[in-house]
Amino acid sequence: LCDRLAAEDERIRVFHKKNGGPSSARNFGLQQAGGEYVGFVDSDDYVDADMYERLYGAIEKTGMPVAQVGRDEIDKDGNILPNICEPVATEQVIPAEGFLKELLMHRGDCSFCTKLLRKDLFTIEQFPVGALNEDFHLLVKMLTREESAVPGIACIPGQAYHVFYRPDSNTRDKNRFSRVFADNIDNADMVLALVDRKYPELSEIAFRFGIFQRLDYLLHIPIAQMTGDNAFYRRVVRDLRHGWWRAMKNPWLTKKNKLLLNRLL
């Protein structure tokens, strides 16, 4: 199908490569892209016909290198699921520090699929191959670069990107313990180090994010893997014990979070 469409429209180019995961495919696409801006659409999803036109308009209007629109998720029966991230009500520019704060509070959208980005943002670093939660990893790197490559993100209202929810995806399969929980913790440690250097006023929020990701790991790991020879599991428990007092004083952790921490330890 893709080859046939490419034969009918010279604007479409199709490449065939060995499956190396989403990051590998995206990085390959970035190497082939010839335009000034890039966007990403997952194979199961679809976008409104004017999505990229609206995103480009926001970039032109604000001068920001990145624009974002809201998304919704649709199940296999066509039902719209509750919002993961609430779209903005009005067009606005969210500064890099504010956008990062929203990500760390689990309110922001790290997906590159809802964004249009200037291609040169990927010159320094691209998607981490072999890792899950790769969008969060790269976006945080962009938001915390010393040269302030992304001073802010232009956000427009509406939900123009539509996610087809697959419960058996790499991060959602309930029948196996996804590696994403460990990758989330590694990303949390990375962002804490970056925040301490770039935005120290967000340090306690970043610490809260790391505690939250570790609690999420312990809530999902199978009992059979809670063993002394599981080095990562031992590390998670050790980190929570070492950070317990700071967590108890953290204003961004809820009472429920703190009760859960005490119960799991």
Give the residues covered by each predicted segment.
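Glycine-rich, basic loop-to-helix element that forms the pyrophosphate-binding segment
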Residues: 1, 17-33
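Acidic donor-binding segment of Leloir-type glycosyltransferases
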Residues: 1-16
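Short aromatic/hydrophobic "clamp" motif used to bind/position activated sugar donors
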Residues: 38
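The conserved acidic donor/metal-binding loop of glycosyltransferases
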Residues: 42-46, 65
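Conserved donor NDP-sugar-binding/catalytic core segment of glycosyltransferases
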Residues: 50-83
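Membrane-interface aromatic/basic loop that binds lipid-linked glycans or pyrophosphate carriers
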Residues: 64, 223-265
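Short, flexible, basic/aromatic active-site loop/helix in glycosyltransferases
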Residues: 70, 86-107
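Conserved nucleotide-sugar donor-binding catalytic segment
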Residues: 97-184
